[in-house]
A protein has these predicted regions:
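Conserved active-site-proximal phosphate/metal-binding subdomains
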Residues: 4-9, 303-334, 338-353
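Short beta-strand/loop segments at the ligand-binding rim of alpha/beta enzyme cores
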Residues: 41-48, 94-97, 211-220, 261-276, ...
Length: 353
């Protein structure tokens, strides 16, 4: 990317910038490769922020299945983080994870959970995880909440064999006029479910997978306490990315935390931030960061700039930090300031990975 008017008098935010179109050989939006160059292994340049109300196991599973990465918050107990990592690593990279219940569960039980899945169904299974039927909200019409599922579920199942490719699965759903069907292994046990939308999306998006073909997940680490001890434990649990995170990343405590984490996890992919200057980027890289997180106060819900007077327009911050990171053979993530889809494209144009 280059600026048509180099050396602007003021720093720029996303609202100040437009991209000028030029000659392109890309015939379709589906021909655009969005795989990230930062070495993480994601195929989509989207990271779910390490916020308690945002990043959890379902978000991590779903986003990784589409090629992105979710970062678990730093304030979650370590044993819970371990269980979430284990859960995500056990999910199928293509098939969606259904809600399962036994035949003796009630309509009330099912209705309390059914909205946690976009496909709007519960798979009723026996003790051996073999599908017996499917329950949807429509099946509850005319029955009270205490009616057991075996009395109302649809037993007309068309199961999909494990290993079926997306196109074949879509054809099976279309032929049988179903929006969702269970996927079973050779022993008839439930592996997951396929949906029409899911099969279509899996032909467009590639999942973010680790070296063992499992979904990827990141975890945040604070700079206080014993970041090295926590980082070592997270790597042993299977975390693919460590994000050393604090609001003001250009400080000596961050640099010390980075150094000790790098010492105990020499091969880990480490992200650190947040900073908004080339100097901050350089010092984080020198301390051990592979990727630098850029942004102080650009978020739509963030009041950092208003309350403290600290920050920098995001487009200029990303551009400057990305240039410095590239000079050092590293990369940056643009953190915050995205209010419109265009802002993602502008962040990538500015140099974000």
């Amino acid at each position: 990317m280059r600026l048509l008017h180099p050396n602007p008098a003021h720093d720029l935010t996303y609202n100040d910038v437009f991209m000028v179109p030029s000659l392109s050989a890309v015939a379709s939006r589906l021909d655009v490769d969005l795989a990230t160059p930062d070495g993480i292994g994601t195929t989509l340049p989207v990271v779910v922020s390490n916020m308690t109300a945002v990043a959890g196991r379902r978000m991590a599973e779903t986003v990784a299945r589409r090629g992105g990465l979710a970062v678990l918050p730093q304030d979650i107990p370590l044993d819970v983080v371990g269980s979430v990592i284990e859960y995500v690593k056990q999910r199928h990279p293509i098939y969606e994870t259904p809600i399962t219940m036994s035949p003796s569960h009630t309509i009330g039980d099912a209705l309390g959970l059914i909205h946690k899945r976009a496909h709007g169904a519960v798979v009723v299974v026996d003790d051996g995880l073999r599908p017996l039927g499917v329950f949807t909200e429509h099946d509850a019409i005319g029955f009270d909440r205490f009616t057991q599922l075996h009395a109302v579920m649809s037993r007309e199942l068309v199961t999909v064999p494990d290993g079926t490719d997306a196109r074949t699965a879509f054809d099976l759903l279309s032929t049988n006029r179903r929006s969702m069907e269970p996927v079973v292994d050779g022993a008839g046990r439930l592996v997951g479910v396929v949906t029409r939308k899911g099969t279509l999306r899996s032909t467009t998006y590639r999942p973010a997978l680790d070296a063992d073909g499992r979904l990827m997940i990141g975890v945040a680490v604070g700079i206080n306490g014993d970041p090295d001890t926590k980082a070592k434990a997270l790597v042993e649990m299977g975390a693919d990315v460590l994000v050393i995170d604090t609001a003001h990343g250009h400080q000596t405590r961050m640099l010390r935390a980075l150094e000790v984490v790098r010492a105990v996890a020499p091969s880990a992919r480490i992200v650190a931030g947040n900073v908004v200057t080339a100097d901050g980027t350089r010092q984080l890289v020198d301390a051990g960061a592979d990727i630098v997180k850029v942004g102080v106060g650009p978020g739509a819900m963030c009041t950092t700039r208003m309350m403290t007077g600290v920050g920098r327009p995001q487009f200029t911050a990303v551009m400057e930090c990305a240039d410095e990171a590239a000079r050092l053979g590293k990369h940056v993530w643009a953190d915050g300031g995205v209010r419109w889809p265009r802002d993602v494209a502008l962040a990538l144009a500015a140099g974000a990975a």
